[in-house]
Regions:
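Extracellular, surface-exposed repeat architectures
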Residues: 1-65, 69-70, 95, 99-192, ...
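Glycine- and acidic-residue-biased ligand/ion/polar-headgroup-sensing regions
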Residues: 64, 80-85, 189-192, 207-212
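Short loop/beta submotifs within extracellular cysteine-rich repeat domains
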Residues: 85, 92-94, 220-222
Length: 299
């Protein structure tokens, strides 16, 4: 069923409780309260353009899947609360910030450039497409649920990843390939962030709070810590790099200035690992392997 839009402005919320579409030829969808709320309990498609009249947030709630298929014009926040938002085309979210709270943003092979990204037990998956950040990435701890990013993640500029500390072994897992000629700083949040992709970003990796944990060995010139020669800095109290049983496929220079009691360089895994990159001690630091061996061959 298609619900045609007869005018460019609506008042109130939209409830989708069956397989309905919201469409409008040459029509822009707006809300007079400057906010659009879609309550989805079924699968649906919004092919009308959501215009600049929506200055406030566009919020998707419910258990259904909503597909945006137009290049939308609004630049405010997009909040996905437990629902699934699927991109039916590229650039459906314009440049606004995105919050995923227990839901999913599925780019479905398309690409999009957004603002800042906040995940609270949320999932972003791109398929063959790429989501490019226009701001920093923040995850908020939510009990026993990790935040997940899969596919391809473009940095767009130097970025800070702020990871909240929850009950999971890994508070956030990014298996997406991270790309861009920029730096990555894990800052502020005390949570555990896992990088599990063969990342191609070319800037310095800095860990200034919490733990960055490896989830892959890397291949060729790419590693979970970016391309060869970037360097990684563990800096400040409470920061650590956990090899997690993975021996990097290439050498990565490492500078340790961290003072985390469990070790600035760790191996919290039963597997023995080798670290073959040059390690420089910028301050007193601890290197520890709680389970398997940690062999250092270049210091």
């Amino acid at each position: 069923t298609t619900l045609p839009i007869a005018s460019a402005s609506l008042a109130g919320n939209i409830l989708i409780n069956s397989a309905n579409d919201i469409a409008g030829a040459n029509t822009t969808l707006g809300i007079t309260t400057n906010e659009l709320v879609i309550l989805a309990t079924a699968n649906s498609t919004v092919s009308a353009v959501i215009g600049t009249a929506v200055a406030g947030p566009v919020t998707l709630s419910g258990t259904g899947n909503v597909t945006f298929s137009a290049t939308n014009l609004y630049t405010g926040l997009t909040a996905i609360n437990y629902a699934t938002l699927t991109a039916g085309a590229s650039n459906v979210l314009s440049s606004g910030a995105v919050t995923v709270n227990g839901g999913t943003y599925n780019l479905n092979g398309n690409s999009d450039t957004i603002g800042a990204l906040t995940l609270r037990a949320g999932t972003v998956t791109t398929g063959a497409g790429t989501i490019t950040l226009g701001g920093n990435l923040t995850t908020i701890a939510n009990g026993n649920h990790a935040s997940i990013v899969t596919g391809n993640l473009g940095l767009g500029a130097n970025r800070v990843f702020d990871i909240g500390d929850g009950l999971m072994d890994n508070d956030a897992i990014i298996s997406a390939v991270i790309s861009g000629a920029f730096t990555v700083t894990k800052s502020t949040g005390a949570g555990v962030l896992m990088f599990a992709g063969d990342n191609s970003y070319t800037g310095l990796t800095t860990i200034s709070a919490g733990t960055l944990r490896l989830g892959a060995t890397g291949g060729g010139t790419n590693t979970p810590l970016g391309t060869i020669g970037n360097g990684t800095l563990v800096s400040g109290a409470g920061s650590a790099l956990d090899l997690n049983g993975y021996t990097l496929g290439t050498n990565e220079a490492l500078t340790l200035s961290g003072a985390l009691a469990a070790g600035a360089l760790q191996n919290f895994s039963g597997n023995s690992v080798n670290y073959t990159g040059l390690i420089t001690l910028g301050a007193a630091s601890t290197i520890i392997s709680n389970y398997g061996d940690l062999n250092i061959t270049n210091t």
